Design a protein with these regions (language model features):
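Extended, Lys/Arg-rich, non-catalytic nucleic-acid recognition/anchoring regions
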Residues: 105-172
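N-terminal compositionally biased, intrinsically disordered segments and leader/signal-like regions
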Residues: 93, 145-148, 155, 196-198, ...
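A broad structural signal for short, well-ordered beta-strand segments within beta-sheet-rich domains
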Residues: 9, 134, 176-180, 189, ...
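Phosphate-interacting basic helix/loop segments used at nucleotide- and nucleic-acid interfaces
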Residues: 212-215
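Short, surface-exposed polybasic-aromatic patches that bind anionic ligands, especially phosphate groups
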Residues: 42, 54, 175, 180-183, ...
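Structured, hydrophobic secondary-structure cores that serve as assembly/anchoring elements
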Residues: 1-102, 108-114, 130-132, 140-144, ...
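Long, low-complexity, polar/charged, intrinsically disordered or flexibly structured peripheral segments
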Residues: 186-210
């Protein structure tokens, strides 16, 4: 501090050494897990429907995740993570090529970008480039005509230090194949792969069938995601698999699970839900919804879809518009893409709402359309029986943990306690002003205590 030798009042500006205030801690990010015909097996961030289809392809034999992601983006979702679960023994498709030496040896192997029988639909042509000292690689999918060309790479060499080294270029740019240099002993042009036309990759396998149990056991793949998640395993209703998802959410403490409905009637749904864990980290919705069939080019064709993806989108859009403390339910939560939904009687609605394992209704409301009309978790006993209460607690815990990361390895003294108190007080005041905490004044809404009482050492 400057020492002043003259009388007067002096003001000095000091930047408060607080960590930056948090914006959203990404409570509105979804996670989807299930069987998909093709695509990355690592958990992958997706920001649009077009990005999803570019990586995982169009509709195929297993469309549950496709439909969930489509409905997520159709209902205001912004970012999701996708985990493609594959069966045991799944393998990539392959094709090897010889070099051009007098005694030919294997010089190059192509594999499908990821496992599954889908890779057996890939074929590759290798042509001499115009320079005569390099090759062009043309990738086809689903046929051998020019309309089946999906990628083309030109002027590729087999020199590991070359700018157009075939392996580096293809592995950096292709969404269909990966390349492996097999280390042929030849050099120069002789090391290039021989020319070939429409050589199919073979031996790709989906492995064993992906079951609900497989998906439940695979959920720990989301450990690489450090954001809070709205988790949905499209179509998974098996009690053991659901228990695995819910246990994962509880153990992490920052995941909330949306459980899709069974295909049966209300009684079947209530019976199934009664076998799920008692937990505030999950909610069940019923019934399924009818949407336009995106796989059909015929007008008017519909299909029955799981609502979990749409609801995850509604969770996300409600978070953005109102805050995580607002229930993702009510007449404003219209399920985009839903054309119709089965009617529920008053008696059925009463039983769904009063059950120990509550089931949230999806209903048609005149003037509003098809909306979510329930916000209960699978925990009937306490205040966190409501979805927004549990999700608010998830948000606050994650936000306050992030805000206080700076304190690790700092001296545990009064200076640190003041910083923590100031950081959390400011954050909670902002959350209170937004409507996230009850009370007409901050003192009625929250208190922060970090002092010698709870830091005795």
């Amino acid at each position: 501090m400057t020492a002043y030798l003259r009388p007067g009042v002096f003001v000095e500006e000091t930047l408060n050494p607080l960590p930056p205030a948090l914006g959203s801690n990404a409570t509105s990010i979804a996670g989807f897990i299930g069987a998909i015909d093709r695509g990355p097996v690592d958990v992958t961030a997706i920001n649009s429907w077009s990005q999803f289809t570019s990586l995982y392809g169009g509709y195929g034999t297993s469309n549950l995740v496709h439909l969930a992601v489509l409905l997520f983006f159709s209902n205001g979702g912004g970012t999701c993570y996708v985990r493609r679960t594959v069966g045991s023994g799944a393998s990539t498709s392959t094709r090897s090529f010889n070099d051009r030496a007098e005694a030919p040896a294997s010089t190059l192997r192509f594999t499908s970008a990821n496992p599954g029988v889908w890779g057996n639909n890939i074929n590759v042509s290798i042509q001499n480039s115009l320079s005569g000292t390099a090759v062009d690689v043309i990738v086809y999918y689903g046929g051998t005509s020019s309309t089946n060309i999906v990628e083309k790479f030109t002027d590729l060499t087999m020199g590991g230090n070359d700018e157009r080294y075939l392996v580096s270029v293809i592995n950096a740019q292709s969404k269909y194949i990966a390349a492996v240099d097999l280390g042929s002993g030849a050099s120069g042009v002789s090391r290039l792969p021989v020319t070939a036309t429409n050589q199919y990759l073979t031996s790709g396998s989906d492995g064993s069938a992906v079951t609900a149990s497989t998906i439940g056991n695979d959920v720990t793949a989301f450990d690489v995601v450090h954001n809070s998640l709205i988790l949905n395993a499209p179509g998974v209703t098996d009690s053991t698999a659901v228990a695995a998802l819910v246990n994962y959410a509880e153990n992490r403490g920052d995941v909330f699970v949306i459980i899709d409905p069974v295909s049966g009637n209300v009684a079947a749904q209530l019976t199934t839900a009664s076998g799920y864990p008692v937990s505030s980290y999950a909610a069940v919705y019923y019934p399924k919804i009818v949407i336009k069939d995106p796989t059909s080019t015929v007008a008017g064709v519909t299909l029955t879809a799981n609502p979990g993806g749409a609801l995850a989108g509604i969770y996300a859009s409600t978070d953005a518009a109102r805050g995580v403390f607002k229930a993702p339910a009510g007449i404003t939560t219209r399920l985009g893409g839903a054309i119709s939904v089965a009617s529920l009687t008053n008696s059925e609605l009463d039983s769904m709402n009063s059950a120990a394992a509550a089931v949230n209704a999806i209903r048609y409301i005149t003037g509003s359309g098809i909306v979510a009309m329930g916000a209960r978790t699978l925990n009937p006993a306490y205040i966190d029986k409501y979805v927004p209460v549990r999700r608010t607690l998830i948000y606050l815990r994650k936000a306050m943990t992030d805000l206080t990361q700076f304190a690790i390895f700092e001296p545990n003294d009064e200076k640190l306690w003041r910083r923590i108190n100031a950081s959390l007080d400011g954050f909670l005041r902002d959350f209170w002003r937004q409507g996230g905490l009850r009370g007409t004044a901050p003192a009625q809404a929250f208190f922060v205590k970090c002092d010698a009482d709870n830091n005795p050492q």
